[in-house]
Amino acid sequence: MTFTPKTLSCFVASAAILFGASTSTAANRPAPSARSVGPAQLEMQVLLDRANFSSGEIDGKAGKNSREALAAFQAAHGLASGARSRKALLQALGAGTVKPIVSYTITAKDAAGPFNKTIPEDATEQSKLPGLYYTSVLEELAGKFHSAQALLKRLNPRARFIAGERIRVPNVLGAEQATRAQTGAVKIVVSKKASVLMVYDREGQVIFYAPVTSGSEHDPLPFGNWVITDVVRNPIYNYNPNLFWDADPANAKVKIAAGPNNPVGVVWMGINVPHYGIHGTPEAGEIGHSASHGCVRMTNWDATRVADLVKDGTPVVFEE
């Protein structure tokens, strides 16, 4: 599988249709389906992730999260969405200067665990586990490389995912460090309608973008202006059935140990509304596509990048 700026430009051209390009050339081309998979889509997702415009879980599919991340990147950089702006977009993304797929050797630490055989759905059963660990090396690597497990299998059809094995992975390492370098006076805005979170710098520029899942009919997002009150890495989850409309009231309150498969993922950012916050999730593939119990859920890696940018007192806006 070879990636080139020419290959990527094919996806950009397709995106022009999806964003309403008016050129006759683009209009005559069929848009890729949300389930289409290919090198152009994968490269675009990797480049957007490296630019801090996340499409959530990298899966190589031209779906909703990818299209909207690309549109947000274009808007933030003053780039039109038509086919004529393709060259400028490719340059802004760094196409051709970074290999989207690189080799990685699975380390002994990657394979050491500890791992859970399975993660029970019931909170009481989860509370009996010493940690909400990954269930496999594959799941751990998927989190490390911001990817769907199915993508890693597709890139490495013969891999056993064991220590010492060399595999092909999305080139996203270092994205967290790049985000951390921008820490400063920022503001978070979450749009319920768009299902996205954006971080703005003091000049009003978007410096981070990611899809989210926020609220539901039963647990609406608390619209308004708030602030971050605490940032907790690897949080212990205090499960209280009284806070959930769909919980069995007979269930007891329990503490669920930390870990990437904890219900709130690897980081919790509380706001000055009781029981509400921004957090990670063990279900990266659902982000942007489902509802939540009122809070703002993100992939674990995106939540980590937001946590690197904020501090107590950071303004947070929840809007419709």
Residue spans for each PLM region:
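Secretory/export targeting leaders with adjacent low-complexity proregions
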Residues: 127-209
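Solvent-exposed, polar/charged alpha-helical surfaces in well-ordered, non-transmembrane soluble domains
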Residues: 42, 46, 64-72, 87, ...
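Bacterial N-terminal signal peptides
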Residues: 9-20
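Acidic, Ser/Thr/Pro/Gly-enriched interdomain connector segments
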Residues: 2-4, 23-57, 99-127
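Extracellular LysM carbohydrate-binding repeats and other cell-envelope/extracellular binding modules
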Residues: 64-110, 153-183
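Sec-exported extracytoplasmic/periplasmic mature domains
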Residues: 49-53, 71-79, 94-98, 143-160, ...
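Gly/Pro-biased beta-strand-loop elements
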Residues: 175-281, 308, 312
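A short amphipathic alpha-helical interaction element
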Residues: 34-82, 142-147
